[in-house]
Each structure stands twice: as structure tokens, then as C-alpha cells.
């Protein structure tokens, strides 16, 4: 019961954010150079402040997002006529919700194909799924996500990216891994 209530709350929150993004896309007078799309890792990351670039960066992350939701609501995340790069970081919630890898890859490939069709001059950066801390104190947080599982997904992401000239796979997994995971 409590889990279902939390799931329903999260879906309503995601819908609010999608609506906000669609409205911002409609009224924005700023043309983005780079659009970051993904889950809470993107949503809560202060991109403009920490990347220190003069390019216009737009953050379109949504907490709890999965590849299926992204595919269904891709229009809420994309706008502009001269986008240089679109950065995708998504998948950890698919793993956490036990979405089959094949389904997530199908969703992600459809996202890539849609972006490629609508933004043929934009470079797509597919960022690897980030590692999780596998210490005892984080078991409830990471749930069924393990670094071994994430490695397998990242290998599949890399293979998917290599099938598209417009897509570059960006490995962040190894760079963020330490002895604790």
C-alpha cells in the first residue's frame, strides 16, 4: 500500500514537471546549445554553475525517470532549432524497477532515433549509468542495482551508441568507481 502511494505520488510529480517543461519550451526566448535529459541525477545537478561554460545549458531531468517515460514524453524535454548537443543520462531507475534490459534498450533506441530524426545536426552524448555504493548502509537505497548489473547495461549502451554516427558513448562509470563501489 505505502509503495503504491509513493509510486502514485512520483507519477504525479513527474507529470507536473513534464507540464512545466512543455510550458517553458513553448515560451522560452533562449535557444539552448546543450540539453541535458535524464533522471534525478540530471535534475538535481547544478549544470550551468559547475560546467562553467558560456553555452546555454538547459536541464530537463526528472526524478524517478525511466526510459519508457522518456520515450512517451520526449516532447517535454526537447526544443530549439540549433541545439549543438543533447546529453542523455538515464537507466538507473529502469534497473531499480527491474525493467528488462532489452525493453530499456528498445526504449532508448527509439529515443535516439526520434532525436536523430528531429535534430539531425545535434550530437547525442549517451552517458553511462553511474556506479552505486555497495556498502551495507546503502543497500536499501540501491535496492537491486549492483555495479555488475550496471556494467552489463553500460556495455549494451556502448554497443547501441556505436550503431549511430550521431551518438557518442561517454563512460563515467569507471571514473566514479572506488573501492566501495
Cite the ranges covered by each PLM segment.
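Short glycine-enriched, charge-decorated loop/helix-capping segments at active-site entrances
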Residues: 56, 100-102, 140-146
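Substrate-gating cap/lid alpha-helix
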Residues: 135-171
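Oxyanion-hole/transition-state-stabilizing segment in secreted/luminal serine hydrolases
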Residues: 43-51, 69-106, 114, 129-137
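A short beta-strand-loop structural module common to alpha/beta enzyme folds
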Residues: 56-68
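Short hydrophobic segments within beta-strands
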Residues: 37-38, 127
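A short helix->loop->beta-strand "cap" motif at the edges of active sites that frequently abuts
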Residues: 119-123
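N-terminal secretory targeting modules
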Residues: 1-36, 42, 46-53, 163-164
Amino acid at each position: 500500500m505505502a509503495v503504491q502511494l509513493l509510486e502514485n505520488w512520483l507519477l504525479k510529480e513527474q507529470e507536473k514537471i513534464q507540464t512545466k517543461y512543455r510550458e517553458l519550451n513553448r515560451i522560452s526566448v533562449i535557444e539552448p546549445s546543450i540539453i541535458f535529459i535524464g533522471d534525478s541525477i540530471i535534475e538535481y545537478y547544478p549544470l550551468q554553475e559547475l560546467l562553467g561554460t558560456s553555452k546555454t545549458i538547459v536541464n530537463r531531468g526528472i526524478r524517478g525517470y525511466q526510459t519508457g517515460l522518456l520515450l512517451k514524453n520526449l516532447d517535454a524535454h526537447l526544443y530549439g532549432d540549433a541545439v549543438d548537443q543533447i546529453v542523455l543520462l538515464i537507466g538507473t531507475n529502469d534497473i531499480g524497477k527491474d525493467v528488462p534490459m532489452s525493453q530499456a534498450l528498445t526504449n532508448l533506441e527509439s529515443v535516439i532515433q526520434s532525436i536523430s530524426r528531429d535534430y539531425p545536426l545535434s550530437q547525442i552524448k549517451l552517458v553511462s549509468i553511474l556506479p552505486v555504493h555497495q556498502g551495507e548502509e546503502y543497500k536499501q537505497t540501491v535496492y537491486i542495482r549492483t555495479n555488475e548489473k550496471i556494467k552489463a547495461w553500460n556495455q549494451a549502451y556502448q554497443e547501441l551508441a556505436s550503431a549511430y554516427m550521431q551518438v557518442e558513448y561517454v563512460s563515467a562509470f569507471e571514473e566514479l568507481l572506488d573501492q566501495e563501489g
